Amino acid sequence: MSQFFSAGVAAEFFPRWQALVGAAREILERRSPAMVDPAETFITGEGKEICMLVIPHHWLGGVSLVIVARPECIDLRWAVVTDLRDHDQIDLGKVVDGWPSLDAAVQALDPVVVQELSRFIQWSCVYRGEAARPRRIRASLDLNGQLSRLDVVSEFSLWPWPRREVVERTSLSSTNPPAFRLPVPIGRLLKQA
């Protein structure tokens, strides 16, 4: 039994999407991306019709590659997933590809997911002075020549404190974790899935 997508809602709850779940599991098992912990990948959804496969980066605080399957279409997107009380964070994600049907998605999924596993993520942490904890954390992705920003943590301040910014590059397939690590809030996410 695969360790990928074994958490959250059971795959059997989504009989319509079994082929998609199987294809995604096979890709992750074959590629085994270093920054993806199989125990942190999970399935959630809205009823039996909408299935969401969430693949978080182990150290980016919820930055995730998400496959969203709806009856009318299937898409692949990047989102910051830290709260599943509703699926707004997933809905507001940055779509990178989409397909009109299950068959089209299963056939095209492999090269697209493999490309996304290697997509560089710019991980930016802004600190106030010499503080150890960042006040702002964001992930940025180059999607079709446009820099798309995903805010992970943002503490607003009216004071113009001296600041320093630390920028790193990582991906789901990177072998080395970023220097500043923000664990996925997996306990809370699985309770809400």
Where are these regions (language model features)?
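Short, surface-exposed beta-strand/loop "edge" segments at domain boundaries and coil↔beta transitions
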Residues: 58-66, 82-91, 145-149
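Long, charged/polar, surface-exposed segments that mediate recognition or autoinhibition
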Residues: 81-123
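Acidic, proline/glycine-rich low-complexity IDRs
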Residues: 1-11, 111-193
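Amphipathic, interaction-prone secondary-structure segments
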Residues: 30-79
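N-terminal domain-onset segments
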Residues: 1-51
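Short, surface-exposed linear segments at secondary-structure transitions and domain or protein termini
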Residues: 73-78, 101, 157-165
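Acidic, low-complexity intrinsically disordered regions
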Residues: 13, 55, 74, 95, ...
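Secondary-structure transition/turn motif
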Residues: 55-58, 79-85, 140-142, 153-155
